[in-house]
Amino acid sequence: MQANLQWLDDPEVFRVNQLPAHSDHHYYHDTAEFKTGSRFIKSLNGAWRFNFAKTPAERPVDFYQPDFDATDFDTIQVPGHIELAGYGQIQYINTLYPWEGKIYRRPPYTLNQDQLTPGLFSDAADNTVGSYLKTFDLDDVFKGQRIIIQFQGVEEALYVWLNGHFIGYSEDSFTPSEFDLTPYIQDQGNVLAVRVYKHSTAAFIEDQDMFRFSGIFRDVNILAEPASHITDLDIRPVPNANLKSGELNITTKVTGEPATLALTVKDHDGRVLTSQTQTGSGSVTFDTMLFDQLHLWSPQTPYLYQLTIEVYDADHQLLEVVPYQFGFRTVELRDDKVIYVNNKRLVINGVNRHEWNAHTGRVISMADMRADIQTMLANNINADRTCHYPDQLPWYQLCDEAGIYLMAETNLESHGSWQKMGAIEPSYNVPGDNPHWPAAVIDRARSNYEWFKNHPSIIFWSLGNESYAGEDIAAMQAFYKEHDDSRLVHYEGVFYTPELKDRISDVESRMYEKPQNIVAYLEDNPTKPFLNCEYMHDMGNSLGGMQSYNDLIDKYPMYQGGFIWDFIDQALFVHDPITDQDVLRYGGDFDERHSDYAFSGNGLMFADRTPKPAMQEVKYYYGLHK
């Protein structure tokens, strides 16, 4: 198969040869590697050769050939944003598309059901291209194994070649993309070529309120899979009605040769609670395990059990060990139309959190994530909405450990396709009811679900943000409901299409609703509990009216709190030659047009993670309903 540039123009082509999404578990050769690191993973982070082209027509066409002369290529650091490495244009936008006012574009199939626009992005004057090259050798432990490459985050359209052979294509910027390199891998001198286009039809559904970057911005790893390997792990802990006992069901997917799987579950103190062995390949399900004296996971006591599965071959040689921490908890929407977690009414003291670092943009470190967790705990914040995309893989485990509720949002926002300068005009909204778009958005829901399905901190799946509503989003809801009965589904955009409210979202979710309007809803025999998915917009000297929302919690059981907009400013440090100091620059400070200017600064913290005075209000009022 050959790569096709026209895939950029077609919303029905969003993954080619990409491996199916799966759980986010790690695997090791033995338990000693839990501390030293897995021998089965090799990082490709660091310096890559790089070429920047302003348009697809200017790209180095055959750069992926092993004999290509790349002496005139630059060097770029991976992970990193192309724009922050000095190429292209830094641009912050809230709702419009980056090309608005310059190039006329409509999403394919929205003006005519037979309309596919050739060259929409593949021959565009504004579609910048990054071409990356990396050479690597295989470590001895990798030789003879199945070899997978994992890109944890690439904006926006990704083509991959190895040693001159086309490997695959993907689009979803914020969930991992994996491809099988085995047919073309060499022991030495491998040439990995990656081409990243800033825009494809995915741009119509990745219109989030943020700086618009491109490039390989999360980790890149080579993974070796042993002869028998657990590719997916599905953990289903279910407390009984009394919450004092429960059962555990676990299903694995084993690729390669049939294997013996030895499972052990320990409590927090390391005591073995249950163990069993199963043999097979493909789908391998363990017998239901019963638990007495159950410890529940909650924000107050985020109790996690330790699962370990050892994989043995036919000669009883240990091939790999898979550890995973999991928790028991319930999430219920009861007949009284109130949400309960572990039989207690849910109160969300939440924030919306973009991933951000003032020096590196959305390239964030473990230190950044741990600092954010500590800030949340110190200020009585008990919930995070991953606005408006899936976060880096470690974030979900950190929230499990800290007791932070998660609303795990799917990578979907099409704001510019239906709301223009504040006016509602959905004539070319996507995904909408368009039969050419549901596969792409359901795939994004599937990726979000599969990667993060085992985390007790997730109590809501979110279908995305500000994308209006239609049959395609209803299909996303149906996907989550079909695959998971242990969580609720959230979506705010159905507010604009009340005829779909019975089929989309378990909660009445609104943005920036006035307290008196919330009261009017709650006193009018509502059908769903109320949740502010965004409120208390913290721009400038804000949050002065937080008490008016907080007072609703004690008066109305169906009022379940909300998520403040937002956690951290999006701003970048730039060296000021006049003062010889690094200063924070916001939207519009990079000579970009158009821009939504300082609207990028709505955080409870400045971009350097210094808390603003408003954080004192948050700590006080959120502390009233821990």
Swiss-Prot record:
Protein keywords: Glycosidase, Hydrolase, Plasmid
Lineage: Bacteria, Bacillati, Bacillota, Bacilli, Lactobacillales
Catalytic reactions of this protein: Hydrolysis of terminal non-reducing beta-D-galactose residues in beta-D-galactosides
Family in the record: Belongs to the glycosyl hydrolase 2 family.
One example of a Gene Ontology biological process annotation: lactose catabolic process
UniProt site (Has an effect on thermostability): 318
Function: Component of a beta-galactosidase that displays activity with the artificial chromogenic substrate o-nitrophenyl-beta-D-galactopyranoside (ONPG).
Gene Ontology cellular component list: beta-galactosidase complex
Quaternary structure and partners: Heterodimer of a large (LacL) and a small subunit (LacM).
Annotated EC: 3.2.1.23
Species the sequence originates in: Leuconostoc lactis
Protein name as it appears in the record: Beta-galactosidase large subunit
Alphabetized InterPro entries for the sequence: Bact_Beta-galactosidase, Beta-gal/glucu_dom_sf, Galactose-bd-like_sf, Glyco_hydro_2, Glyco_hydro_2_AS, Glyco_hydro_2_cat, Glyco_hydro_2_CS, Glyco_hydro_2_Ig-like
Gene Ontology MF annotations: beta-galactosidase activity
Pfam families linked to this entry: Glyco_hydro_2 (PF00703), Glyco_hydro_2_C (PF02836), Glyco_hydro_2_N (PF02837)
Keyword Membrane recorded: no
Residues annotated as catalytic: 466 (proton donor), 534 (nucleophile)
